[in-house]
C-alpha cells in the first residue's frame, strides 16, 4: 500500500503516521 512505498508514505504523514 501507500505507506510501504515512498514518496507516497512521506507525502501522507496524516495517513501513515
From Swiss-Prot:
Disulfide bonds join 2-8, 3-16. The modification Glycine amide is found at residue 17. PROSITE patterns: ALPHA_CONOTOXIN. Residues 4-6 are annotated as: Ser-Xaa-Pro motif, crucial for potent interaction with nAChR. One of its GO terms (cellular component) is host cell postsynaptic membrane. Its main location: secreted. Expressed by the venom duct. Keywords: Acetylcholine receptor inhibiting toxin, Amidation, Disulfide bond, Hydroxylation, Ion channel impairing toxin, Neurotoxin, Postsynaptic neurotoxin, Secreted, Toxin. GO terms for molecular function: acetylcholine receptor inhibitor activity; ion channel regulator activity; toxin activity. The keyword Metal-binding does not apply. It is found in: Secreted. The modification 4-hydroxyproline is found at residue 7. The cysteine framework is I (CC-C-C). Alpha4/7 pattern. Belongs to the conotoxin A superfamily. Alpha-conotoxins act on postsynaptic membranes, they bind to the nicotinic acetylcholine receptors (nAChR) and thus inhibit them. This is Alpha-conotoxin In1761.
Amino acid at each position: 500500500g501507500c505507506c510501504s512505498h515512498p514518496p507516497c508514505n512521506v507525502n501522507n504523514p496524516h495517513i501513515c503516521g
